UniProtKB/Swiss-Prot annotation:
One of its GO terms (biological process) is dUTP catabolic process. Its EC number is 3.6.1.23. This is Deoxyuridine 5'-triphosphate nucleotidohydrolase. The keyword Nuclease does not apply. Keywords: Hydrolase, Magnesium, Metal-binding, Nucleotide metabolism. Belongs to the dUTPase family. The keyword rRNA-binding does not apply. It is an enzyme of class 3 (hydrolase). Its cofactor is Mg(2+).
Length: 151
């Protein structure tokens, strides 16, 4: 796997810093942990922003950090990211907050240190847009939303 240097600042001065950890040597995403003063109960249908206590500095504009749900929390408890995927731009310096929604039927309790999401670093390309009279033809054309079938 490729690696990049990511500078981290811990924004909570009242707690000992804890660097993010990869769960296994082959993990693509690094776990983000909740940084809480007390337990947080997320009711069904409720959206909350969970602080991580971390701020990062990406090495250059060609890299972005993307926050994804943890598969176990989503499949077992219905805890998903409220915005689908969190995008951390290379020039953002604030605390990483994870916006989650409880799509389950039961309240979900988050404790300090719980692994609540995962962050993946990916290359980012800046689009250089230009206006065209028409787009090139393809076999698919304008077909979308299930136009290619399910089997």
């Amino acid at each position: 796997m490729n690696s990049i240097k990511v500078k981290i600042a811990y924004v909570r001065k009242d707690k000992a810093p804890k660097l993010p950890q990869y769960a296994t040597p082959g993990a693509a995403g690094v776990d983000l942990q909740a940084s809480l003063d007390q337990e947080l109960t997320i009711e069904p249908g409720q959206i909350v922003k969970i602080p991580t206590g971390l701020a990062i500095e990406l090495p250059h504009a060609g890299v972005g950090a993307f926050v994804f749900a943890r598969s176990g929390l989503a499949s077992k408890y219905g805890l998903a990211l409220a915005n689908g995927v969190g995008v951390i731009d290379s020039d953002y310096r604030g605390e990483i907050l994870v916006a989650v929604i409880n799509q389950g039927s039961e309240p979900f309790v988050v404790k300090d240190g719980d692994r609540i999401a995962q962050m993946v670093f990916l290359p980012v390309f800046i689009g250089e847009f230009y206006l065209a009279d028409q787009l090139d033809e393809t076999g698919r054309g304008c077909g979308g939303f299930g136009s290619t079938g399910v089997s």
